[in-house]
Design a protein with these regions (language model features):
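Internal intein/HINT superfamily modules and their associated LAGLIDADG
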Residues: 1-167
Length: 167
């Protein structure tokens, strides 16, 4: 679910670009429903593997081997969707070891050093089963480098990042 109008606008534009028809939104609508069948061919062509659990997800090889501008867009999107900008650091959590280390490798191209710690956490899906999650954080000089090179689409996160970089 997302109520950020910039994110919703981007979803509409991307859907249109790929020929996916989505209903005209109501003023109160904060979500779009896109059937998986429409997205299947687009993401399969990019190397996305369907039917995997979160812990088994990977960053597609085409992203890891792509030009830096493409990797930059991918990193920005991950932080827009999953990231947190705190008072002292930035972070995101993932159940996938592969995604954590893939992000670490991509961020190093930009001079950003990602720390990865494993923590037992429950998913947000309501089950209270604890599983290992990879908590990925960066702070210090890496904040300044991230803020200088990346622009987040989520305005509240971008503003928080700019404030953090000024400290």
């Amino acid at each position: 679910y997302n109520s950020d109008q910039i994110v919703l606008s981007r979803v509409r534009k991307l859907a249109k670009k790929y020929g996916i028809v989505i209903p005209i939104p109501k003023k109160t609508r904060t979500t779009y429903v896109l059937s998986t069948s429409r997205l299947y061919s687009i993401f399969s062509n990019l190397g996305y593997l369907w039917g995997k659990k979160s812990m088994d997800k990977v960053i597609p090889k085409c992203i890891l081997e792509s030009p830096l501008e493409t990797q930059k867009t991918f990193v920005q999107t991950i932080f827009d969707a999953e990231g947190y900008v705190g008072k002292t650091h930035c972070e995101f959590a993932t159940a996938s070891k592969s995604i954590a280390y893939g992000m670490r490798d991509m961020l190093r191209h930009f001079g950003i050093w990602l720390r990865i710690n494993v923590s037992m956490k429950s998913a947000t899906n309501g089950t209270k089963i604890k599983r290992p999650y990879f908590i990925c954080t960066f702070g210090g000089n890496s904040i300044d480098r991230f803020a200088a090179q990346f622009k987040l689409q989520t305005q509240r996160k971008q503003k928080a990042l700019e404030l953090l970089a000024k400290k």
